[in-house]
């Protein structure tokens, strides 16, 4: 019947409109979800970098594993300067130094030794979770982390580290074609297909590849 044909045609039209809508919203939804994950992962990589920098300050090399980094954060202590009072404009004009003001009891400067975790990341920070990639549902993903020694242009040996997670892991449950496109684009540009802080191939001052 004409009515049946009209209904079928309407269904086809609706499906076409829906597919067209999905082709637009699919990438938008993908980008939105990727941004949420990117932001959480970048925040975690910045925390790892902060811990690695202080680890190197203490041990002259980076932590080769998360076990070593966790032990450092949970057991080692870092100096924390307590400041009470500041030099007044009048004292500064008279050339008084902080050391002189401390000696005279006008201001206070004391050093306390505080757990590395508390100083760098806060008392409530979950150190045990540091090794895991955040914001990804399902089975936990562990960041890949490694260290190396590189030679600078002037011949100095420089200790470096890298910590990373590839797109294929942290976007594993999202649109496979869109993830493939991301990976393909990064590889064609000679870039790491994912998020990484530091590098084992070049001296980049612990930069993140999002910076």
Question: Predicted segment positions?
Answer:
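Short, small-residue-biased leader/transition segments that mark boundaries at the very start
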Residues: 2-5, 9-13
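Amphipathic alpha-helical segments typified by the pilin-like N-terminal helix
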Residues: 4, 18-40
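N-terminal alpha-helical signal peptides/signal-anchor transmembrane segments
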Residues: 38-59
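Low-complexity, acidic interaction segments enriched in glycine
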Residues: 57, 61-211
């Amino acid at each position: 019947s004409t009515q049946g044909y009209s209904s079928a045609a309407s269904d086809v039209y609706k499906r076409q409109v829906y597919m067209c809508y999905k082709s637009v919203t699919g990438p938008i939804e993908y980008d939105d979800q990727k941004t949420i994950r990117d932001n959480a992962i970048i925040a975690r990589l910045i925390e790892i970098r902060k811990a690695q920098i202080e680890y190197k300050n203490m041990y002259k090399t980076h932590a080769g594993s998360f076990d070593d980094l966790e032990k450092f954060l949970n057991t080692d202590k870092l100096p924390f300067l307590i400041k009470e009072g500041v030099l007044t404009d009048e004292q500064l004009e008279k050339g008084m130094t902080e050391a002189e003001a401390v000696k005279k009891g006008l201001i206070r400067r004391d050093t306390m030794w505080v757990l590395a975790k508390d100083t760098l990341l806060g008392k409530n920070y979950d150190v045990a979770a540091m090794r895991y990639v955040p914001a990804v549902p399902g089975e936990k993903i562990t960041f890949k982390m490694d260290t190396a020694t590189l030679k600078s242009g002037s011949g100095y040996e420089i200790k470096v580290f890298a910590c990373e997670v590839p797109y294929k892991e942290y976007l594993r449950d999202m649109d496979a074609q869109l993830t493939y496109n991301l990976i393909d684009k990064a590889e064609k540009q000679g870039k790491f297909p994912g998020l990484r802080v530091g590098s084992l191939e070049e001296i980049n001052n612990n930069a993140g590849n999002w910076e």
